[in-house]
Amino acid sequence: MRILPVALLAGMCVLPANLSAQHVTADGAAQTFSFLTGQYFDDYFKMNPTAGTAAGLHQYDTQLEDYSAAGVGRQIATLHDWEKKLSAIDPKALDAEPAADYQILLNSIRAQLLQLEVVRGWEKNPDGYSSGVTGSIFSIMERPYAPVNVRLRAVVEREKLIPQVLQDARKNLKNPPRIYTEIALEQIDDLVDFFTTDVPSAFADADDAQAKADFAQTNPAVIAALKSYGAWMKSDLLPRSNGDFRYGADTFSKALVYDEMVDTPLDRLLAIGLADLHKNQAEFARVAKAIDPAKTPQQELAELATIHPAPDKLLQAFHDKFNSEIAFIKSHHIITLPSDVEPVLEETPPFMRATTQASMDAPGPFETHSTKAYFNVTLPEKGWSPERVAEHMAAFNVGTLVSTSVHEAYPGHYVQFLFEPQFPSTIRKLIGANTNVEGWAHYCEQMMLDEGYGQPGAGADNAREANLIRLGQLQDALLRDARFIAGIRMHTGVGGAMTQDEAVQFFVTEGYQSKAIGEMETKRGTSDALYLYYTLGKLEILKLREDVKKKRGAAFSLQQFHDDFMKQGTAPIKVIRKAMLHDDSPVL
């Protein structure tokens, strides 16, 4: 279960003695749970200050996570202590909504313990350290929530602590999987470039003499520490990186329960994923035949990749899509838009361009100063060859342009952000299930086209373009289906063990992706084991919609369904099912 960006917790919580060990009676359950929730998040952000920054709690900006082995030990002890405190509450004594929040919070704690005690990424993933500390600085840079001098001073304080983190990494890392060390080595030069170029550029306007003088000391020290870390990984860690990245079936199943509240047996889950893959492949073949019966799917995709706006028209193309999607959402009563304020559409800032093509940057739930959301689009760089420009722009083809704008903005992530003030609790604002967040955005890609968007006069210029838009949506769906299947098979062996090479080939032959995408997705899947959550969430939402439709009958309204879903926050779909259907029926 996702809590705003998480690193490593450290420190101990302190609660009144009468709440720490005694079983809480029914009469005091609601009050006690409310109190404990506040205490938990106070401690959580003290131990995860980067997450505090992302949430908009800037009292944590000058602090950094404790990555030491002792810090990990304190985190584990803290989480067990919190698990014990929460277990003293009888959830049956709580009303329906707080009872659901109780389970969300308890599962989140257990998910963190599973990662620390069983998966043990802190002993296995060297990139968690180098990218983790980089993320701590990026979280201060990415939004102008405070004057540049204030944010530079925060960067200096965090940078002072980074070299020690990279020393802690050397002590903690035992026997990483070779692929993890290879990924960390692939990343390290970009991280060095980030501190060499992007961080100074972001604070070029600072005029606090002392902060600038301090930064002139801390930033080179971080660069040197990262270079040293990279050299150590290459000469020392890589030759002894012989570990296993696989979760195993038991850990994978537990992670699904704790993160997503899904307890479907893995063999059935795999069958569901394969069925969706085959359904989308059949639909892809049907649409491709309608475009040109003489071409193979691969030939159709090669043509699709060439149909995109000119680079200097890309931002305007997204602006036009937003307007078109907003008009369609309103005229077809897809969902209530809580605000007419649109995200700020802009070119991706330089320090983000290496890692994203298009992204939605929304403020944290407690941000009070920089409250705008930014939709960032990465344009080709000056000096690129025509071939590289063409490769980059293929990601913004006529199909992907629609899928991306729907997924990231209307009615995907941005609209969910607009509903955030209506989320029923702090827990729903801070802890989210990926099957909800990414499942909703992926569901929207299909739902909008099913409802008629992307047809001539509604997002497409003609019937051929409408088919190309659907083809792009289906290719994106097949990518998510391939993740679903590869994740299960690589990590559990259910359905037959899958090697990394076999996973790459699966993405190419069954997911209709390029080899480069297949390699990238396979690498991601070695550490993001549960990246099935896109398709899993979409399928859960589709089933929920059908079940609500059956229950409401003639009174069913798609807009009302979507509004009701959004107002529940980013909770696991199981929680939302119970709120909307008042039963414990299966999510799939």
Identify the role of each PLM range.
Residues 22-588:
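N-terminal maturation segment of proteins
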Residues 5-16:
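Bacterial N-terminal signal peptides
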Residues 16-22:
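Signal peptide processing junction and immediate N-terminal pro/mature segment
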